[in-house]
Amino acid sequence: MAKQFLIVGANSSIGKEVFTLLSKDGHEVFTTSRGSFDNPGRHFITEDLSSFDEMEGLPNSLDGLLYCPGTINLKSIQRLQIDDLLADLEVNFFGAFHALKGLLPKLKNEDGGSVVFITTVAANVGMPMHGSISAAKSALQGFAISMGAELAPRVAVNCVAPSLTNTPMAEFLLNSETKIQASEDRHPLKKIGNPTSIAKTIELLMHAKDHGITGQTFNIDSGLSTLKA
């Protein structure tokens, strides 16, 4: 049966892949981003991540919400400023909070729904220079597990925590064969992430309520967070 989903940050690499997968399955997928996106009649340009409750044109109920926006702001503690932390929190955590709160009435309609947040392996493994993004995504993971408890049994809430992924946002970390090889070598499976494989896990989690999955963080990191090999 066709479902109705919303992808926030759909013009991200992972968001595009999830959109493609869900659309191919015959679902109605609404999208938002700060720029244009090829989804006629169902795309909304959102400059303000705090105004989801004011969005017009969405259906009365949603079966799933995916929040994709993220940042990569790598700085040492000596260089980090409060403004850096606030900027990362605004995109990675506060935006997700506003999305869930604003859209919750739609997610709780009818049979309930599933929510997926994208976090990072750095929320689970200590990494140099990741203080700001780790703090922001850790806040999101803590929020997600709390919401999983609070919103049960109507809404399932889960996270996906990728490692370094080959996307335009991470290009500065992967712009040479030497950097790519070094990144792969840090992972037990000797692979870095790619948007397609991450999107396939997210596609499953967009139906998480149907499968009895909630309150979980799925580490898609080639073993980096749990294995020493």
Where are these regions (language model features)?
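N-terminal Rossmann NAD(P)H-binding glycine-rich loop of SDR-like oxidoreductase domains
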Residues: 11, 15-19
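Substrate-binding pocket helix/loop in short-chain dehydrogenase/reductase
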Residues: 76-77, 81-89, 183
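Alpha-helical segment proximal to the catalytic Tyr-Lys
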Residues: 105, 148-153, 211
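Catalytic loop of short-chain dehydrogenase/reductase
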Residues: 114-139, 144-152, 164-165
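Short, flexible catalytic-loop segment of classical short-chain dehydrogenase/reductase
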Residues: 161-172
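A conserved structural motif in NAD(P)-dependent oxidoreductases
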Residues: 187-198
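Short C-terminal tail/terminal secondary-structure segment
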Residues: 214-229
